[in-house]
Amino acid sequence: MKFISRFFYAFVVIIILFALLYLSSVYYLGIKAQDSINREIALLRESSLIEVTGYHYHRGWFRSEAEATVRLRPSVLKTIHIGRFPSVLKLILQRPVHLKTRIWHGPLAHHQLLRAYAATEVVFEQQAEREIIKFFAIGRPFHIQDTIHLSGAGKVDFTLGSVDYKELSGIQIRFAGLWGELSYQKDYKEYVWHLKVPKFFMRLAD
């Protein structure tokens, strides 16, 4: 009987120690996940194409949330001659975009041995979202997933839906969608792009 009692107590102690170890690892990886996401935002701030106008990160124990507000830089809009674009496309490109990210962190995030897994929802302002539906048939056609390994390296997968748009003025836009993958080393010291870019056709107004 004493043997059974000792075995039971030892089993309980092992379970408690395992639970504490797991909770500690989840908390620690939550800190490291925030470091990784903050680094990605810092890289966006350094971009010559995009400016970050707002950023907030809320860290939880098992899951965290981040939100960044970005927009194309005025110099980019000038370079692409935004004034010649269709009015709906001008509205979309000139307005800020909200990147709402949910981050799952821990040794078994997304059923894998990871630092974190992040899924980002690209949210346009309400007026722009209504116009986007005219192009993509859905209001949120852009999807991003970020898989961060324990080492800090990882990959970002993103997809953009297809477009088939026409106006009576003669404007036409056809685009078969976009798929891409960015594989990166820790702190983005090295990274490689893999893009699948289909044919793009656009006819502007005369």
Task: Mark where each language-model region is.
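Hydrophobic membrane-insertion alpha-helices, especially the h-region
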Residues: 8-26
